[in-house]
Structure formats: structure tokens, C-alpha cells
Amino acid sequence: MRLILLSGLLLLGTFLANGDEKDSEIQLLNSMIEAVMILQRDFSNLRYALMTVHNARSFGSGSERVYVSNKEVSKFEGLEEICSQAGGHIPSPQLENQNKAFADVLERHNKAAYLVVGDSANFTNWAAGHPNEADGTCVKADTHGSWHSASCDDNLLVVCEFYFIL
């Protein structure tokens, strides 16, 4: 944006130095300069709003991950598409505070939701007797954040995980 502004000013200076003061060209340059200044202001406002939301959402959890539900339910098979269309992923808490933030969403809705547990997970929160493939090959978290083996065909609360890396 600054390059556009500087180019416009350079062009304006060239017109003035050549004595070529065409009103329409000067008005066009002034309009461009004004438009760039408005864009810079709008960008600053948008960045401030985004940072405010980010800080508010991550304040309570201390996490750069945010867990959000659309209040719908889905089987595991459709969950990745739902989350990816929203710009997120299936939840995969890697730390206790992330699992707590995820569980807070489940508690508010009083429903369980699917999550993904990686093979190299440093953090797990399995309930007693789990994992147990007899219950299913998917994983769900209950309203307390405990993980249970589950059928992938259960309709559970849609919760997606979003990363804030700024």
C-alpha cells in the first residue's frame, strides 16, 4: 500500500515539475491517495478487531487454539469436511489447557464430540478402561473432557478447532 502511495506521490511530483497540471489527473491521484489511506485505516481497524477477538478467546484457556461449535451434530465421516469448510480442523488437544477449553464447549452444550488422537500424542486424557476398540475405533470426549472409544457412526456435537498464529 505504501508503494502505491509513494508511486502516486512521485507521479504527482512529476506532473507538477513538468508544469503539466491537468486537473483530472491530479484529482485522480488525490482520489487514489485517499483510497489508500482509507484502506490503511480499515486494515488497522480489522487487525485490531481480530487481535481483540483472539486475545479474548484465548485468554481463559491460555491456548492458541480455539474450539467452536455450530450446535449441529454429525457422524465422524462428515466432520473433517465441515471443519475444513469453516477453516478449522477436527479437535486434537495436545495439552491439558487445550483439552479443558475443548471440554468447556462440550459442557456448555451438554454433549460429547469427536476428537483426533495422534500416535505421538504427549498428552492423553483417556477415561478408565479406554481406549477400548470394542466400543469403536473413533474417539469422543465427554462433558468433563475425558476421552472414550466410540462408534464413528454416532451423531455427536460438531466442534472444530481453530489455530491462532499471528
Curated annotation (Swiss-Prot):
Disulfide-bond pairs as recorded: C83-C160, C138-C152
Key words, A-Z: Disulfide bond, Glycoprotein, Lectin, Phospholipase A2 inhibitor, Secreted, Signal
Leader sequence residues: 1-19
Gene3D superfamilies, per database record: Mannose-Binding Protein A, subunit A
Name of this chain's protein: Phospholipase A2 inhibitor CgMIP-II
Summary of subunit composition and partner proteins: Homomer composed of 20-25-kDa subunits that form oligomers of 180 kDa.
The organism's taxonomic lineage, starting at the top: Eukaryota, Metazoa, Chordata, Craniata, Vertebrata
Domain C-type lectin stretches: 46-161
Organism: Cerrophidion godmani
Example of a GO cellular component annotation carried by this entry: extracellular region
InterPro entries with a match to the protein in the record: C-type_lectin-like, C-type_lectin-like/link_sf, C-type_lectin_CS, CTDL_fold
Keyword Signal recorded: yes
Main location: secreted
Pfam families named in the record: Lectin_C
Residue positions with a glycan: N122
PROSITE patterns: C_TYPE_LECTIN_1 (PS00615), C_TYPE_LECTIN_2 (PS50041)
UniProt PTM comment: N-glycosylated. The glycosidic chain may contain superficial sialic acid residues.
GO molecular function, one term: carbohydrate binding
Expression tissues: Expressed by the liver.
Subcellular location: Secreted
Superkingdom, natural source: Eukaryota
Chain's role: Selectively inhibits the toxic properties of myotoxin-II from the same venom (AC P81165). Does not inhibit PLA2, anti-coagulant and lethal activities of the basic myotoxin I from the same venom (AC P0DQP6), nor the different crotoxin forms (heterodimer or subunit B alone). Does not block the enzymatic activity of crude acidic PLA2 fractions from the same venom.
Protein's UniProt keywords contain Secreted: yes
Family stated for the protein in its record: Belongs to the alpha-type phospholipase A2 inhibitor family.
